[in-house]
Curated annotation (Swiss-Prot):
Species for this entry: Kluyveromyces lactis (strain ATCC 8585 / CBS 2359 / DSM 70799 / NBRC 1267 / NRRL Y-1140 / WM37)
Alphabetical list of CDD domains matching this protein: HRI1_C_like, HRI1_N_like
Keywords from the UniProt entry: Cytoplasm, Nucleus
Disulfide pairings: none
Subcellular location: Cytoplasm; Nucleus
GO cellular component terms, semicolon-separated: cytoplasm; nucleus
Keyword Flavoprotein: no
Protein name per UniProt: Protein HRI1
Organism lineage: Eukaryota, Fungi, Dikarya, Ascomycota, Saccharomycotina
Family classification: Belongs to the HRI1 family.
Length: 241
């Protein structure tokens, strides 16, 4: 099921909750996913993101707990913290539980181990508001299941000797991660968030990185298609067009 959710609360327990980003997480019908988390106030920040990560359906395990809750175990293919070798960064599987409230908000709980699996467990909690991916403005959905099943669900990927990346399209919203292999600095990280307007043109909202112009300029493509941007070939690994 296509999903676009906006984070409205982040809490590292036992600290008080807060939200300093405009975080959106996108998931396609087949389970390919990406989360891009730019700071609302990025002034003075060399890297204006709290975090960004993503992966294909091979990098997530979902199990149903009951009608309202699922366990999701993530093992990200793309993780900016790992890419940058940020100290005290969790590596490996992150176990989470997603529970839908009566209001339609989705609570995510889980824990990470920044000092390794033998180190101290750090618990966290996030709250997500499902939004309509077919709209250019943020329109809240009463329930994530209310999303238009005909909404665009497209994923593009690249993996060659120099680059690896993933782009997710849900409805009118596009998010992408592109890493330059072997470059574990900000020079090796590219992120973007865009929208598809009424004329099917791509309008950039967030763009970061020296190679950000290599993100695909056309995304409304059939599965199996190839598109090239600034010499970089992207393969469409999922499309419902």
């Amino acid at each position: 099921m296509v999903s676009l959710t906006k984070r409205v609360l982040f809490e590292v327990i036992p600290n008080p909750p807060d939200e300093t980003t405009l975080t959106l997480s996108s998931t396609t019908n087949k389970g390919h996913y990406i989360s891009v988390r730019p700071f609302v106030n990025a002034e003075g920040k060399e890297f204006p993101f709290e975090w960004a990560f993503g992966g294909t359906s091979d990098h997530i395990e979902l199990k149903k707990i009951n009608e309202r809750a699922n366990s999701l175990n993530f093992n990200f293919k793309f993780d900016t913290n790992v890419k940058l070798n940020v100290p005290e960064t969790h590596r490996g599987v992150i176990k989470t539980v997603f529970k839908t409230w009566d209001s339609g908000l989705v609570e995510e709980t889980g824990s990470v181990f920044p000092w390794g699996t033998e180190g101290t467990e750090v618990k966290f909690r996030e709250l997500w508001q499902p939004v309509d991916p077919t709209r250019l403005e943020f329109v809240e959905l009463n329930n994530e299941k209310d999303v238009d099943q005909a909404a665009n669900s497209i994923a593009l990927s690249v993996d060659n000797e120099e680059y690896e990346g993933l782009v997710i399209v849900v409805g009118r919203w596009i998010q992408g991660i592109l890493f330059k292999k072997g470059v574990n600095t900000l020079d090796g990280i590219n992120l973007f968030r865009s929208q598809i307007d009424e004329k099917n043109s791509i309008v950039s909202l967030v763009k970061f990185g020296a190679d950000a112009d290599k993100f695909p300029q056309e995304v409304l493509l059939n599965e199996g298609s190839i598109t090239t941007s600034k010499g970089l070939e992207w393969s469409v690994i999922e499309s419902n067009l």
